Amino acid sequence: RLRRQRQMCIRDRHEVVHNRKVVEDLKSRGAKFVDELSEIPDDGITIFSAHGISDQVEKEAKLRNLKFFDATCPLVSKVHKEVIRFAQTGKDIIMIGHKNHPEVEGTLGRFPGDSKGNMYLVENLLQAENIEINQPNNLCLVTQTTLSVSDTEEIVLKLKERFPLILEPKSEDICYATQNRQDAVLSL
């Protein structure tokens, strides 16, 4: 309906979700998927994916007068808020996730530049074993929501062993729907 009203093509920054059926349906309705805001005409319309966006992407969209709809998953938004809250208290933050994944890029991009802490990305157990932290006694942990609990379990245990005072979120960051699907596949 919005496309008809504006007679414009809606461009989605990244695929909205990791769901082929949804993506194909949107494509059949004329949606175009782009990687960067520079691929969207000024005054264009865009949808930000469920993976979330960095502060810089949001600022650029506003600066260019793009009409945008933020489809960030509520669980991803929760992680963004945790990062901001932890950063405001000057904590160092470790994020467990995959480099270059849109969700990780968006979450890392929510870390305020004026924080007294630092943000680190840990992708695997080897990195968890070797990471050097500026504030090991003032440290917290967040995770990419689309990882499975089993993917992060060893990493979290290693980080807790190395940094006994590390704070975790009050509730799990892993998406329960993702975990349920992964558990179902494993049970086959």
Residues of each region from the PLM?
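Single conserved hydrophobic/aromatic residue that forms the stacking wall/gate
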Residues: R1-I10
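Short internal beta-strands
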Residues: R11-V16, M95-G97
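N-terminal beta-loop-helix "entrance" segment that forms/cooperates
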Residues: H14-A31, T178
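Short acidic low-complexity segments
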Residues: K32-P41
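Internal gly/pro-rich beta-alpha loop/helix module
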Residues: F68-F69, E82-Q88, I93-L139, T145
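Glycine-rich phosphate/diphosphate-binding loop of Rossmann-like nucleotide-binding domains
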Residues: V142-L167
